[in-house]
């Protein structure tokens, strides 16, 4: 075991000693700051605290007339860590993280929808009431399903995770179907009044795919010709197809008849 190096902890005392001895003309600007906020004197580094995951549930307890709020604690599994990762800070985890992971695993295309991340005051979540899925001023997305499922788990008595997921998902599908119908009806009404729309995203994608296919077909033909020419340079030129498949003329080649 080597000795402790306390040079960094005594940097202020060193600066004051050098000023008193006349080695420096004036003190550095950080001397007063380090005097007000000194560095830590603890030489032993403790491991980060392992936080517990607390869940709120409403359950009907035996002997109770009304459902009561119960806080469930889930102990984290302690995994052996490497020495280099022993003092890393603990990851911050919430209950809705797992709910969000399951929803987007079942609905991966929801991540492709555009999202609005700008908030008016930064506290828009305080005005949301997740007793219903659709919120005023918020676009319907996967996060709405996650928050709705979490509200059901925290407020409905004896609610299970799968049942809350089915309820929130059913409401989400119904609202999405309603949005699609409204969008289709609005487009039909606009076309009836003379509006014209350009190609859809699907049509644009198909056109780009066709162009790419035609470009690839031309490239494939050129590559095939290059390969044939390269093979012919090593094996010799092949006979034309007309000479190879020329039929034998029976009239020119007559067998003499015997007398």
From Swiss-Prot:
GO molecular function per UniProt: structural constituent of ribosome
Name of the molecule in the record: Small ribosomal subunit protein mS23
Gene that produces this protein: rsm25
Keywords: Mitochondrion, Ribonucleoprotein, Ribosomal protein
Protein origin, superkingdom: Eukaryota
Annotated transmembrane regions: none
Region spans: Disordered: 230-259
Family annotation (InterPro entries): Ribosomal_mS23_fun
Oligomeric form and interacting partners: Component of the mitochondrial small ribosomal subunit.
Biased composition range(s): Polar residues: 230-244
Location in the cell: Mitochondrion
Family that this chain belongs to: Belongs to the mitochondrion-specific ribosomal protein mS23 family.
GO CC field: mitochondrial small ribosomal subunit
Pfam families: MRP-S25 (PF13741)
């Amino acid at each position: 075991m080597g000795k402790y190096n306390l040079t960094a902890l005594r940097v202020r005392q060193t600066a004051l000693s050098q000023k008193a001895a006349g080695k420096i003309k004036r003190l550095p600007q950080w001397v007063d700051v380090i005097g007000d906020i000194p560095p830590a004197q603890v030489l032993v580094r403790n491991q980060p605290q392992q936080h517990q995951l607390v869940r709120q549930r409403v359950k009907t307890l035996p002997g109770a007339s009304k459902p009561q709020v119960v806080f469930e604690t889930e102990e984290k599994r302690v995994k052996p860590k490497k020495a280099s990762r022993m003092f890393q800070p603990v990851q911050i985890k919430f209950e809705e993280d797992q709910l969000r992971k399951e929803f987007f695993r079942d609905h991966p295309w929801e991540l492709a929808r555009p999202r609005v991340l700008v908030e008016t005051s930064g506290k828009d979540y305080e005005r949301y009431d997740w007793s219903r899925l659709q919120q005023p001023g918020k676009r319907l997305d996967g996060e709405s399903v996650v928050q709705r499922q979490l509200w059901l788990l925290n407020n409905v008595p004896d609610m299970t995770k799968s049942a809350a997921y089915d309820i929130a998902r059913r409401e989400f599908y119904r609202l999405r179907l309603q949005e699609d119908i409204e969008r289709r009806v609005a487009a039909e009404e606009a076309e009836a009044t003379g509006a014209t729309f350009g190609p859809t995203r699907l049509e644009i994608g198909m056109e780009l795919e066709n162009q790419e296919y035609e470009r690839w077909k031309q490239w494939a033909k050129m590559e095939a010709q290059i390969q044939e020419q390269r093979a012919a340079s090593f094996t010799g030129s092949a006979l034309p197809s007309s000479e190879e498949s020329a039929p034998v003329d029976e009239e020119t080649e007559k067998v003499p008849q015997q007398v």
